[in-house]
Curated annotation (Swiss-Prot):
PANTHER family: ACTIN. Oxidation of Met-45 to form methionine sulfoxide promotes actin filament depolymerization. Methionine sulfoxide is produced stereospecifically, but it is not known whether the (S)-S-oxide or the (R)-S-oxide is produced. This is Actin, clone 211. It is found in: Cytoplasm, Cytoskeleton. There are at least 4 actin isoforms expressed during artemia development. It is an enzyme of class 3 (hydrolase). Actins are highly conserved proteins that are involved in various types of cell motility and are ubiquitously expressed in all eukaryotic cells. Multiple isoforms are involved in various cellular functions such as cytoskeleton structure, cell mobility, chromosome movement and muscle contraction. One of its GO terms (molecular function) is hydrolase activity. Keywords: Acetylation, ATP-binding, Cytoplasm, Cytoskeleton, Hydrolase, Nucleotide-binding, Oxidation. Belongs to the actin family. CDD domains: ASKHA_NBD_actin (cd10224). The modification Methionine sulfoxide is found at M45, M48. The modification N-acetylaspartate is found at D3. It comes from Artemia sp. (Brine shrimp).
Length: 376
């Protein structure tokens, strides 16, 4: 069934971006926004050979005349019709493959509802006729990508953050914590604090500019209060940014105030714990005998962990929370933006994994429930 000459497809569907490619590659071939757009009014797009929907970058570029929807909210698929469109676009337009010819590895959020896994399985076999498929937990793939099987992953993307303790390759569900604070909340916050400076960013197009400012200029301060004092006393932390229209804006303490919300969610008016405390709480829900292994293998994953300075700050904050004798190590691989996908690429190309796929035959015999017996 799974011959070596047929590469498996690896598709990591995030709330913000979809990453897709071939098992064995070291990076995804296609990375595009997880959005589906439909025309707001019939007949606006004259002579364009009007399509009833657009996906990804094309939807983004035509957003003026479309209604945009994100089918994945907080990491969980909520709109299956649109999700099917994204998968269709992934296979046929981005990767240009026939899904009925390749095993497909999909990723899922931690604590994904059972019904969702079944639905994913059903769509792969019934709509796309895949010969085989598998569903893996995102954080587990990230830890594989870091060359480990035990540790705790802080996976923070665009729509949601999770802390996932993993022991010998298995996620420990009772200790997984979810924090609904991630990249898109930080963009909202940066838009707000830039407005306080007198720059107005309100439209979706301007939101993309703010996303770019966030990705290029923001960083995490080691000591927030001290950094605020430095920013107030001198201009050493100021950076200028050129807007598409040529106007140049200056951004100062916003550079580190924006990601500080990860450590102090009260900045966003949220009552939840910061990411450092969430990691600690997650570890404390685990058996006392494995905690030392988790502290020593704390792996960062996802685009929202890409800020310069975040690993040092995590080290400092968790050291302050943990027992004083414990060794704490924060692992922040440079490719962590794509580590879920990379872990999937590694897993799907292992010879030992080939018997783990759910085959079409098994699906036909057992139905969608097979996913709970074979993917855990």
């Amino acid at each position: 069934m799974c011959d070596d000459d047929v590469a498996a497809l690896v598709v990591d569907n995030g709330s913000g971006m979809c990453k897709a490619g071939f098992a064995g590659d070291d990076a995804p071939r296609a990375v595009f926004p997880s959005i589906v757009g439909r025309p707001r009014h019939q007949g606006v797009m004259v002579g364009m050979g009007q399509k009833d929907s657009y996906v990804g970058d094309e939807a983004q570029s035509k957003r003026g005349i479309l209604t945009l929807k994100y089918p994945i909210e907080h990491g969980i698929i909520t709109n299956w019709d649109d999700m099917e469109k994204i998968w269709h676009h992934t296979f046929y337009n981005e990767l240009r493959v026939a899904p009925e010819e390749h095993p497909i590895l999909l990723t899922e959020a931690p604590l994904n509802p059972k019904a969702n896994r079944e639905k994913m399985t059903q769509i792969m076999f019934e709509t796309f006729n895949s010969p085989a498929m598998y569903v893996a937990i995102q954080a587990v793939l990230s830890i594989y990508a870091s060359g480990r099987t035990t540790g705790i992953v802080l996976d923070s993307g665009d729509g949601v953050s999770h802390t996932v303790p993993i022991y010998e390759g298995y996620a420990l569900p009772h200790a997984i914590l979810r924090l609904d604070l991630a990249g898109r909340d930080l963009i909202d916050y940066l838009m707000k604090i830039l407005t306080e400076r007198g720059y107005s960013f309100t439209t979706t197009a301007e939101r993309e500019i703010v996303r770019d400012i966030k990705e290029k200029l923001c960083y995490v301060a080691l000591d927030f209060e001290q950094e605020m004092a430095t920013a107030a006393a001198s201009t050493s932390l100021e950076k200028s940014y050129e807007l598409p229209d040529g106007q140049v804006i200056t951004i100062g303490n916003e550079r580190f105030r924006c990601p500080e919300a990860l450590f102090q969610p009260s900045f966003l008016g949220m009552e939840s714990c910061g990411i450092h405390e969430t990691v600690y709480n997650s570890i404390m829900k685990c058996d006392v005998d494995i905690r030392k292994d988790l502290y020593a293998n704390t792996v960062l994953s996802g685009g929202t962990t890409m800020y310069p300075g975040i690993a040092d700050r995590m080290q400092k904050e968790i050291t302050a929370l943990a027992p004083s004798t414990i060794k704490i190590k924060i692992i922040a691989p440079p490719e962590r933006k794509y580590s879920v996908w990379i872990g999937g690429s590694i897993l799907a190309s292992l010879s030992t994994f080939q018997q783990m796929w759910i085959s079409k035959q098994e699906y036909d015999e057992s139905g969608p429930g097979i996913v709970h017996r074979k993917c855990f």
